[in-house]
């Protein structure tokens, strides 16, 4: 088995990280830990760890960056999306951007704003995109809009994390799940993450 309790974001589909954690306690199993992070610039990993370590049901573990250059971390409000879209338009490297959303309904809103800025984009269907389709979509010179769940396992140079991440909900599971979702979203970014919440 391979797993990362910090990225266990499928409780709503019946996924239970406790099963995995219990297996790790089994004396008949040998556990190996992958501690090096090769993807994220140091400060992106730092903010992701700050978010996840506030979750109540995660193991404490050592994750260290292998990239020590500083990336860019921006935290702003959702209503500033257009400002950052204009920067993408000016830069012109559309394929270097993901816009990750919490819920599917935000994809439509973002699509409209990208069209208003004349920025090419593609959207992904959660669970309905084959590997061949995924490769073709990823190679297009267009901004990719997808849910955080769909983005799991992917990476890009720049990520805008857009939406309502209710990480202060009173429910124990809700708080932990939302922190894990936010962690996954932040860690898709290699060089720059813009969090619009």
Give the ranges of each region predicted by the language model.
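Short secondary-structure boundary segments
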Residues: 197
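A short acidic, often aromatic-flanked loop/helix-cap motif at beta-alpha or helix-coil junctions
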Residues: 37-42, 79-83, 127-132, 152
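Well-ordered alpha-helical segments embedded in enzymatic catalytic cores
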Residues: 19, 80-84, 147, 181
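Non-catalytic alpha-helical coupling and interface elements of nucleotide-dependent molecular machines
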Residues: 25-28, 49-57, 86, 115-120, ...
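Core RecA-like ATPase module of SF1/SF2 helicases and allied nucleic-acid translocases
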Residues: 90-194
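Inter-lobe coupling/hinge region of RecA-like P-loop helicase motors
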Residues: 28-36, 56-102, 143
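Conserved RecA-like helicase ATPase core segment
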Residues: 1-71
